[in-house]
């Protein structure tokens, strides 16, 4: 086996926002990260995994106010939930901290002052929407109104989820405060900006570049899909980044600027550093060795694809121009769907981590299933609940655990727990040992699905050996004791090798294997040796099959009480009626029935679907921002929709949109988006009025 140079590796996953417990979407990322970290530690590298709660911002402040507690009380309460959720799924954080910490305050100020000294901070007067009832400036997401481009109602202050347009909140038509429902007014305020536009040359080089690791391997900073997106954004021109917010705000006050606070996206990524600094103080590590400009250590961020902009542009630029090292790699992943659709509270598929554990499901079942779907690319993965049951029961119980259960008992009963001193069927074990480096390469590249496919293929070979040698029959035959011990020793060693290869994914089960074999914690290099002439303990069953009834219990536990929602009083924040119009104004809008001929995802967009719609007299190409509500676009083919047919064509970067598809939505976007149905017999081109 190849002995690798010891590496020093710092790993993070995205900071969960401190407003609620974790759900399976969070766990996908933490599991992906944890598997990689456990693998690196098994290889003998010095590897640390840190995370923290993202605690600052207006939403935290307002949520605490609503409950009558302080923001500090709220974030401390939620942190306890997050720690319990993570530990329940066997996530091995070396430190789980908070962005509301003295270390983060000091580091945020240090970074800001360094950027200011390098003339990367600008002060400008801006106009911003202000809630006259709450006496506060409104963040973009707390302003709603009509899209200035397509007039879709109930859109956020920064982008339209219907047509995909981006804009300033001041451009919204008929805006209202999502906090109080009041009509906001414009007020001026001085804000601080990070001059991101001046960082384009550095970012072009960094995003397309790579770092050389201590073992000599070259690590690209970004995945190919991420690089393509960054090239698009950099090519379109980078805008300076507003890094300040006005009081009242829960966060850190900017040095020398009373009443001004760091925007959450400035101090949140610095929270990675703060969590690690806190760990360094506890373990007596040299923090500067890891974050100095010329650091030879490695730093990796595991994130969701929706926060790429911050981690692949804003964060490395901020680090570089404050005199610190940039990341070695940013690894983005896709979203989690359940049974082919976005997680849904009403369907019971918005699964909370705590609920999964409380229903009695083994966290290693989910760790294995998610790993079996993950690769190094930015692809959404689907948790198919029927497949989840079938795969775990087949792979982990039927193939893997079955090897030990069919052999270990004979070693205990017939040979007093003693393995044979040598084996005659060494070829099968040599084959398993030879797979170690290829499996290691798959784990290193985050190609977990490939690694687990290969491990299960090896398990199939071992189970073939079981069936060919039938230890239960050997046990009945006189004079076959030596052969029985030989065969069972081969099987116990094969089980041990497979357990080594699965340990990053199944750490608790691996502990059970280590106790059964009476060995020290298994490392990757232990695959080089065999366990011979050693006494082992009696085998204890390591994993149960999934009872499908547990899945039914889980779904029921996560179903939202729809009747309670229907009976609940209306929220204080409501969308005011638009300005009264005359019948002549309405007559200007030409609504037509259309029939969907084609519907596809739009590459490069997380929000849009591309429709080809038959309007009777012609076929139109229409982009619609309803992807999150319709995860299976092929199922919309043949459906009738309502189209604003005389809307001016709009050129988008994906093509020209020739109309708008009408949808229904509530004030709260969590209520969903819904296409409108028409009765049978309708024909494309019919006018709606």
UniProtKB/Swiss-Prot annotation:
Annotated EC: 6.1.1.10
Chain positions of motif 'HIGH' region: 16-26
Gene3D superfamilies tied to this protein: HUPs (3.40.50.620), Isoleucyl-tRNA Synthetase, Domain 1 (1.10.730.10), Methionyl-tRNA synthetase, Zn-domain (2.20.28.20), Nucleic acid-binding proteins (2.40.50.140)
UniProt keyword annotations, A-Z: Aminoacyl-tRNA synthetase, ATP-binding, Cytoplasm, Ligase, Metal-binding, Nucleotide-binding, Protein biosynthesis, RNA-binding, tRNA-binding, Zinc
CDD domains: Anticodon_Ia_Met (cd07957), MetRS_core (cd00814), tRNA_bind_EcMetRS_like (cd02800)
GO cellular component terms, A-Z: cytosol
Domain of life (superkingdom): Bacteria
Record-linked PANTHER family: METHIONINE--TRNA LIGASE, METHIONINE--TRNA LIGASE, CYTOPLASMIC
Function, in words: Is required not only for elongation of protein synthesis but also for the initiation of all mRNA translation through initiator tRNA(fMet) aminoacylation.
Protein's name in the database: Methionine--tRNA ligase
Phylogenetic placement of the source organism: Bacteria, Pseudomonadati, Pseudomonadota, Betaproteobacteria, Neisseriales
Gene: metG
